[in-house]
């Protein structure tokens, strides 16, 4: 049987964590990644070179590569001294390869091949873009990193230039997908930013593949303050122009006082789930008692193994293929 074609849409840490888990399964992975980041090492490079943001792309390439390889470790290495302090070597390699090939998309393909990744990593657009936001009070905020600093409710986000075209490979992947997964990650700056690229939303909506949203566990200050799971989904649907999400994976776990206090100090709290409200809109809600893990310093994160297994199980419900058996359970 052919492998299931799973397309991931997003950016930031969330997408790379999910990709790292899914690479262990017998699926054909394509990650469509936002290129609107303008902070940190990525921002410095973009100030010098007018290229799409390399940072989120770098993280996903590393996640899909052989995690034990020296090349993969080198790709994620970050300098700490002198004039290149703060720069990731992977970002510099992407920038250098872009100069060599004169094409950001070609640079990503070349580096993906060098690192022997499982699957494909595709920028949502091959154009250098800036993400802006219109706040509910009408103020326009320019640049991704400035959006959450305003601590205002976001009405919508948009890209400059506004006529950017998608990577054709991204459109083809959406058309051919068996399952499309959005998130987890910053709602507006990592997920919805991809839908701002002309053609992405249309291809997503018209794809025959079921669509799944992986909800964040905690609200994000300055971006999703007070948002429920449904609020996250509603924001995605507003950008796309119509409802399309069929499944949502979300946490219903309760957290101890230490965890809640740590997040309250950052003006963040658990994303609330109203299962009946979601099911009323024909969204199939998937949860797990151990979807989230808590670190020693009381930070909550998706359990990579549990999340990727849930996504694969959903895919198996939809597609006839050979079930995956972990190597330690094979006879």
Task: Give a label for each model feature.
Residues 2, 21-27, 33-50, 166-167, ...:
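Conserved phosphate- and dinucleotide-binding cores of soluble alpha/beta proteins
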Residues 127-188:
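Active-site gating loop/helix substructures
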Residues 226-331:
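C-terminal functional extensions of proteins
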Residues 13-14:
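Hydrophobic/small residue at the entry helix of a nucleotide-binding pocket
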Residues 74-103, 185-189, 218-224, 255, ...:
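Glycine-rich phosphate/diphosphate-binding loops and the adjacent beta-loop-alpha structural elements
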